[in-house]
Amino acid sequence: MEKFQGYLEFDGARQQSFLYPLFFREYIYVLAYDHGLNRLNRNRSIFLENADADYDKKYSSLIVKRLILRMYEQNRLSIPTTDLHKNPFLGHTNPLYYQMISVLFAVIVEIPFSLRLGSSFEGKQLKKSYNLQSIHSIFPFLEDKFSHSNYVLDVLIPYPIHLEILVQTLRYRVKDASSLHFFRLCXYEYCNWKNFDIKKKLILNPRFFLFLYNSHVCEYESIFFFLRKRSSHLRSTAYEVLFERILFYAKIQHFLKVFVNNFPAILGLLKDPFLHYVRYHGKSILATKDTPLLMNKWKFYFVNLWQFYFSVWFQSQKIHINQLSKDNLEFLGYLSSLRLNPLVVRSQMLENSFLIDNIRIKLDNKIPISSIIGSLTKDKFCNLLGHPISKANWTESSDSDILNRFVRICRNISHYYSGSSKKKHLYRIKYILRLCCVKTLARKHKSTVRAFLKRLGSGLLEEFLTGEDQVLSLIFPRSYYASKRLYRVRVWYLDILYLNDLVNHD
């Protein structure tokens, strides 16, 4: 992100003027619509079909020049709200303009925020690794920490239903009044559109709304992490680099003034040295080793924090307390729980021997096979019973294209669920995809499955195994790989950067 700092060309007078590059820097639009920056499309399907939005294909430099000219010639901020539908710039006839402006506004604001966030890493004993961006990097942390926890608080992070709450939250980070007014105008115009098809197309590019959501959640986490550090017996420095702290301490001072009388009681209420927090996919989990009473106190705290400080209505039913030893926690497409492994250790001292019973607690991650079968059924890879069927809409493609599609899907699923403690369900998913591939090819060539396999041999199905086997053979010793014990080992691939459709089955 540092190499894009020069595109903004901020000086002392325009350091907070985000509208300046929006109106006068034509190449910032090229930066915003560079597919290299948008390669991690969060809406991209694991099935890799129709990944690009329609409006991205309509982008051209001529439209950018026309848009900048219209913004420069007229003062659009003076248009009354009642006349928005008559506005030729932000009107119903030009939804593409809003798409371009919303994406660009998010990019312009993201760059200085990212630079400040990167500066917070300086002097910290935390290495900047791209592996930390992987979703799977969370699971080793959970395996290490959750084995000492017994209760988990599953929280659905609320989102404000009123746009003005987001604008007020953004004011803590953006001090440019004109940019906030322009942002409010664009957002209200989007909300006033009655054409649902236009809204659906514009929301396919989530950069703008993702930025608003992260800004909103960041303010909530700033308060939570502050209480977490002050209430904990252990002064961990890892929390200092988890979120952006622009104008953070000023907000904390205001928070202390509001709760100045009850603040010591709050810290005593929530004191817990074994508290672990993880946020993922619009949810957050809070794990602790304490009693259910403490979890109910945290539940009460979250409800009051959202309602009274952030003006967001939040129901306590959206917070679930799970006991890891009894309940399964739905986490990033896995069903996680604690498994007790009894161990018997024999100790011998001189002529006396002792048997010591020991229990080892281990985080057990299982594959939700019923949900995945439902997703495969929805995309017509199998029926409701899990029996593979052919993909009729893929028969128009070439044989190599069909095979590559199935291999890519199978590899993605295998990499994501390689951390499962039981591979039986993973093998069933692979079997469904392999047989679905064979049935699709047989249908294309108007043949039966048996005749098609007899004609091509078993080498066709080896494409599903070669890539993964080569990777694992480089990681583990040959003797370990040949003993079949590898299939009982959990392997976390650190290249999973987005949630796929099979994981996001909700």
Swiss-Prot record:
Keywords assigned: Chloroplast, mRNA processing, Plastid, RNA-binding, tRNA processing
Domain of life: Eukaryota
Localization per record: Plastid, Chloroplast
The keyword Plastid appears for this protein: yes
Pfam families linked to this entry: Intron_maturas2, MatK_N
InterPro entries assigned to the protein according to its UniProt record, in alphabetical order: Domain_X, Maturase_MatK, Maturase_MatK_N
GO BP field: mRNA processing; RNA splicing; tRNA processing
GO terms, molecular function: RNA binding
Main subcellular location of this protein, as a coarse class: plastid
One of the record's GO cellular component terms: chloroplast
Role according to the record: Usually encoded in the trnK tRNA gene intron. Probably assists in splicing its own and other chloroplast group II introns.
HAMAP family tied to this protein: MatK (MF_01390)
Family (UniProt): Belongs to the intron maturase 2 family. MatK subfamily.
Protein name stated in the entry: Maturase K
Annotated source species: Arabis alpina
Gene: matK
